Amino acid sequence: MGKVEILIIESVTPCEQCRKAEAIANELAKKYEGVTVRVINVLDPEADKFGVVMTPTVVVNGVIISVRRAPDPERLERLIKNRLGGV
């Protein structure tokens, strides 16, 4: 079984979309074993690797999947299932 890391890069003061992205990711992490969620601030040096200029930015296994809004829950779930090996 694969592993999935969801990285949410939030604004200094998390906005509504940041909080929504975090809630969606955490809900899916509870549903699927092997999924982890990390949340960092846009000022974190790690955010520089992705060239983040707008938040939230949602990254799955190193690939940006959503910018400036929470990801679509169904799309994120399909991506997770695919990365986990078709759970």
Give short role names for the model-derived ranges.
Residues 36-54:
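Thioredoxin-like thiol-disulfide oxidoreductase module
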Residues 22-40:
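Conserved helix-turn-beta segment immediately C-terminal to the redox Cys motif
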Residues 1-27:
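Local sequence-structure signature of Cys/Sec-based thiol-disulfide redox active-site neighborhoods
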Residues 61-87:
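Non-catalytic, surface beta->alpha helical segment in thiol-disulfide oxidoreductase systems
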Residues 21-23, 52-55, 73-74:
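Short, glycine/charged-enriched secondary-structure capping and boundary segments
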Residues 1-6, 49-61:
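Conserved N-terminal glycine/acidic-rich loop preference
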Residues 13-16, 47, 65:
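Glycine-/small-residue-rich active-site loops that bind phosphorylated ligands and cofactors
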